[in-house]
Amino acid sequence: MSRIKLFFATCALLSCSLHSFAQIDKNKIFNPVTTSVTSQSVAPDARAGGMGDVGAATDPDVASQYWNVAKYPFTISRAGVSLNYTPWLRKLVSDMNLAYLVGYYRIGEHSAVSTSLRYFSLGEVQTNYNSTGQGAALTVNPYEMSFDAGYSLMLSEKFSIGTAVRFIYSDLKADYTDDVTPGSAFAADLGAYYQDYVNIGQRECQLGLGLNISNIGSKISFGGDNNSYFIPTNLRLGASLMVPI
C-alpha cells in the first residue's frame, strides 16, 4: 500500500515539474518588439544621410529639427527653410519617396522656433480584397506623415537645450469602416548641444557634443486592431570636430 502511495506521489511531483517546465519554456518564446511608422527613422536630408546618418553633434543647419533641435540657437543665419525630396529604394520600386519641409527662425540671440512637415509615400500597392475581405482588388496608396514644432534655448554661450512635439499619422489602407481607421500618435523630442572652440596646434577647431532622444511618446494603434505598436524611439549621442584646412 505504501508503495502505491509512493508511486502516485512520484507521478504527482513529476507532473508538477513538467507543468512548471512548460510554463518556463513558454515564457522564453521569442517575442520581438513590433514597431510601426518606421519611416520616421529615414534620414530626410542629403548632408546627414551622406555621412552615415549622423547629425546629433554636427555643425547646426536648417535640417537640425530631425537630428537635434537644440542646435538652432547656434546657427549663423537668423532664419532658414529647406525642402528635401528623397526617392526611396529606387532600384527596387519606382514610386516610393520621402518629402521633407523644414524651417526655423531665431528669436533674438538666444532662442529659436522651428517646424517641419514630413510625408513618406509607399507608392501604389495592389491588394487582393478590400478592407472587408471581399470584393474586387483595390489599388492602395499608403502613406505616413508627421508634423512637429520645436523650441530651443541657449542657456550659456556654449550650451543649449531644445524640445519638439510631434503628431504622427499613418494611413495604410484604401477604404475604411467604423472598425478600421488610420493610426495616429503623439511624440516628443529632447535635445542638448554643446559647442566650443579648441586650439589644436595653430588651428582653432570647433568642438560639438550632442544628445538627442526622439519620438518619446504613445504607441500607435489602428481601429479594429486590438494590438498597439511602438513608435521608433531613438537615442543619439555624438561628438564632432571641425578642423580648418
Task: Briefly describe each language-model feature range.
Residues 23-245:
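Subset of outer-membrane beta-barrel
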